[in-house]
Amino acid sequence: MKRLFSAKLIAALSVAAAVLTGCTTGTEETLQYVNLSQVSCSFLGEGNQPLVIEVKASPATWEATPGATWVKVERTDDRTLTVTVDDNDTGAERSTTIAIVADQASQEIRVNQLAKDNEFARFRKLDTFQMGAAMSPSGKYAGGFTASIAADDSWQYSPTIVDLETGEVYEFGPFPESLYYLTQTMAITDQGLLFISDGSNGGQIAIDLTGNIFIPEAPAGFTSKPDIQGTSADGKYWVGFGMKGKAFEDETPCKALLWTDGVPTELPWPDLNYRDEEPWYGGMARGISANGEIIYGTSWENWDFGMLYWVNNGANTEKPKWVGEDVREVWEETMKNSDGTEYTTHLVNGLICQAQLTKISPNGKWIASSYRTETPAEDRLSIVTTQTAAFYNTETETTTIVSDYGESVGVHVTDDGIGFIGIGTLGISSGVVYDLNTGTDLGSTQDWVYDNYGIIIPAGYINYVSADGRFVLGTKAESSAGGVNFINWYIAPPVAK
């Protein structure tokens, strides 16, 4: 285990990069290239240490040119570039590039610098994490994993936990992909127990602050390892799902699960599915309120994604209700196959949820969702849908549909009814904030963060806010040479000095 502490420099995942160019001089061809030990780096707003980057180039003579005056570069020898940055007094995040040129070969280093911390809050990116990050229910920890390349050119993974109160970082491994092929971060408890999916062996690993690893177990009779999706703040309850049988062979093989002190039990399932028809696959539990009282999940049959919730009573938990029952409508409709034959099905206007894990408020009073309508197309060969953000109050059992923003998704909601909405339905890159009590638009994600924390952040949307409001987890879309990446960021109180 590496036990790292808050550093003056945050360096992004190092990626070796090379640009090769063939040049012909008379009858002789020479190979020109620029090979960098690191093609991107991030700095804090102030107090940074110099960053050294290794440069291998042919021809050996190369030049480095920064794209902004706040970045300083020095070629300290034939193969070393030292990068320093001025303190960032702009109040906002900034970025630029450094161009490395060796005759006709060239490469760029992307440089990013955060704004200075203020006395109320600090903003950090988790851009070294692969496949996202999870925040614990009370905001104590954030967890994820980093990836690197082993000596044999295979992948290796390092589970990583960040203490958001102290800035301390716990890094474990790296573990070879042949042992743990880590694919997605799912959840972390306030006690620092991190759950990451294993794409090779199935199920997940669970790793704690000491580096101890175990594999969560499903109830007896299950045919696969389970997946934990969320936890309560005290770590007593975990929720998720597992397979008990095979699809199309066994009745509702996908089972929602609840663990109490590590012991798993099946959660009951509705008699009829989202379309008021016989269920054939089942579904999952996706999240649980921080206080452990309310669990939410989703059906997983075709494109239904019907959202439901349970009132947690341990092994005696009763069957769930559909989220948004007060606005849910189900009716019979005659549709057509491509060959012109007709069949009867049921269409639904109701609340849905896919694989999102942060849709419930800490005390379980509110659930964020999406209200989807279904209408037969004119030729009745397909179904036309609309989708808009919606929020359900589990105490009053009433739904608030927010249609102000067109196609949108309810991402998260606080105990006092502040809703966070993602604009669009796929590849969301921006968000707005809405007061469900007054029906008031509170502005964009950036506006709300500035109004409440006094800092300027880049565009994005909010995934989760702790019950006391001190910790925030969000998502930002970043463009790179490989396309658009979605990275997580967090807001936390300043580290005590």
Named regions from a protein language model:
Residues 117-497:
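Conserved "turn/edge" positions that cap or connect secondary-structure elements
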Residues 45-46, 90, 415:
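Surface-exposed loops/turns
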Residues 46-52:
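Short coil/turn motif common to extracellular beta-sandwich-like domains
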Residues 86-92:
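Short, surface-exposed loop/turn segments at beta-strand-coil junctions that are enriched for proline
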Residues 2-3, 7, 11-42, 103-129:
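Bacterial Sec-dependent N-terminal signal peptides
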Residues 92-104:
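A short beta-strand micro-motif common to beta-rich folds, especially ectodomain repeats
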Residues 34-38, 52-82:
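Surface-exposed binding patches on compact interaction domains or structured appendages
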Residues 57-59, 66, 102-104, 406, ...:
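A generic beta-sheet turn/junction motif
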